[in-house]
Curated annotation (Swiss-Prot):
Molecular function GO labels: L-malate dehydrogenase (NAD+) activity
Binding residue positions for NAD(+): 7-13, 34, 94, 117-119, 227
Family classification: Belongs to the LDH/MDH superfamily. MDH type 1 family.
Protein name (record): Malate dehydrogenase
A GO cellular-component term linked to this record: cytoplasm
PROSITE patterns documented for this protein: MDH (PS00068)
Cited function: Catalyzes the reversible oxidation of malate to oxaloacetate.
Gene3D superfamilies per record: Lactate dehydrogenase/glycoside hydrolase, family 4, C-terminal, NAD(P)-binding Rossmann-like Domain
Pfam family, one: Ldh_1_C
Residues the record marks as active site: 177 (proton acceptor)
Keywords, in A-Z order: NAD, Oxidoreductase, Tricarboxylic acid cycle
Species, as recorded: Escherichia fergusonii (strain ATCC 35469 / DSM 13698 / CCUG 18766 / IAM 14443 / JCM 21226 / LMG 7866 / NBRC 102419 / NCTC 12128 / CDC 0568-73)
EC number: 1.1.1.37
Amino acid sequence: MKVAVLGAAGGIGQALALLLKTQLPSGSELSLYDIAPVTPGVAVDLSHIPTAVKIKGFAGEDATPALEGADVVLISAGVARKPGMDRSDLFNVNAGIVKNLVQQIATTCPKACIGIITNPVNTTVAIAAEVLKKAGVYDKNKLFGVTTLDIIRSNTFVAELKGKQPDEIEVPVIGGHSGVTILPLLSQIPGVSFTEQEVADLTKRIQNAGTEVVEAKAGGGSATLSMGQAAARFGLSLVRALQGEKGVVECAYVEGDGQYARFFSQPLLLGKNGVEERKSIGKLSAFEQNALEGMLDTLKKDIQLGEAFVNK
């Protein structure tokens, strides 16, 4: 199994690469790519960790050598948020980066599963889909927006509030991956109940958690370490499913039946070909139903922005 990380010299990429080097199954290959000249050195640094995961690093304009034979490609390349920016302010720079990298994937490893981490995910996934479509290699079961950070944050915040162990909590999060489009389904956590005020406050905290980190880092970056952990969790789940493990479920932002929007984050059963089944979002509370209806215009606009970027 070969996993490629694009944007591997950045804050998220390095954290992600470290976790994959220590946790991928024995015999896996890990390929690191970034435009930054330091990237082969990051690979050498990680190569000293004693795990049976082969690692190589590649730098420069051409990602092709890193992508050859990849089964999974995780894209974290792009610029990070600064205070006062929201994820959509990143669009102008990151849209071009994602478009270019996905074009290289389309020619080099068109059958790979692709996980997009680069923000704004609501939009960059639509860009990736349109690029793959133009190249005639789009498979909607193999393109994912990685929203796992919203899930791990939800798990952490709920556990803190309710005095539970965080590994006992699994909160499904649906919708998209910014602001109001992030909708944690707090009504679906077994054995945990909330007051209306707790639901409103927790939902807002989960939606604004990225900004909490950006402000706390005081201009020194955005969420890199928790995002690295979230991306590793998603990537490792995908690898396990591709290798035939049954019953692997993760939420991610994918193209579905269009019931809510063309792309929508929901629980997915993963399998040997990527998405095996898009699972129902289940029964929503009145608060959740209202939040879902209220976000769809924003989500659809984010998606259209990405489609238009490729098709202009």
